[in-house]
Amino acid sequence: MPGARVAAHLDALGPLVSYVQPPLLPSMFYVGLFFVNVLILYYAFLMEYIVLNVGLVFLPEDLDQALVDLGVLSDPGSGLYDADSELDVFDGYLE
């Protein structure tokens, strides 16, 4: 049978197309996601550095007055946040 001989001869030659590895899309997606997260962290720390170190140059001499101008403090003489003022509110309640 000549067809069987041809088929055996073709089987001996091996596959006509070499094996192609499937693409690495899922793993490459996670590699890309990792680098995007690294870039986000880099820019977050860069912004923090700029705000904390470069921004300190532009702070005024009178920090209390600057906080009043921003609306953080209502009275320049009050100073920064005082934790003892909260206790005065509860003095009558606890007795």
UniProtKB/Swiss-Prot annotation:
Which InterPro entries would you find in this protein's record?
Answer: Dexamethasone-induced (IPR023259)
Superkingdom as given in the UniProt entry:
Eukaryota
Q: Which Pfam families match?
A: Dexa_ind
Q: Which family does it belong to?
A: Belongs to the DEXI family.
- Protein name per the record: Dexamethasone-induced protein
